[in-house]
């Protein structure tokens, strides 16, 4: 069974500022975007040509203030070649 790291999520208070930072600091660019129909969230995935790993930036309309360390959820995602076997293992 093979696990592959897929993406890392960070919640951000200012999506445009965060996108600009990762573009400038790491040379990442937007590869896809998902926005709620009601405008409650926006999710932007960023990457580069060096790796398939993606950075996921999540903006939540109802959380305009800066995030405190440890306050928000985050996740590290993996892709697996045999999901039923991975589920059984874990």
What do these predicted regions represent?
Residues 2, 9-52:
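Core segments of cupin and vicinal oxygen chelate
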Residues 33, 58-60:
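Conserved beta-strand termini and adjacent loop/short-helix elements that scaffold enzyme active sites
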Residues 50-53, 62-64, 83-84:
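Short, charged/polar surface micro-motifs in flexible loops or helix N-caps
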């Amino acid at each position: 069974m093979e696990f592959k790291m897929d993406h890392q999520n960070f919640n951000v208070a200012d999506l445009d500022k965060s996108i600009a930072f990762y573009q400038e600091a790491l040379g990442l660019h937007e590869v896809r975007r998902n926005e709620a129909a009601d405008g409650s969230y926006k999710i932007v995935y960023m990457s580069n040509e060096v790796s398939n790993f993606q950075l996921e930036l999540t903006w939540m309309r109802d959380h305009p203030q800066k995030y405190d360390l440890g306050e928000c959820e985050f996740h590290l995602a993996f892709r697996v070649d045999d999901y039923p076997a991975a589920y059984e293992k874990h």
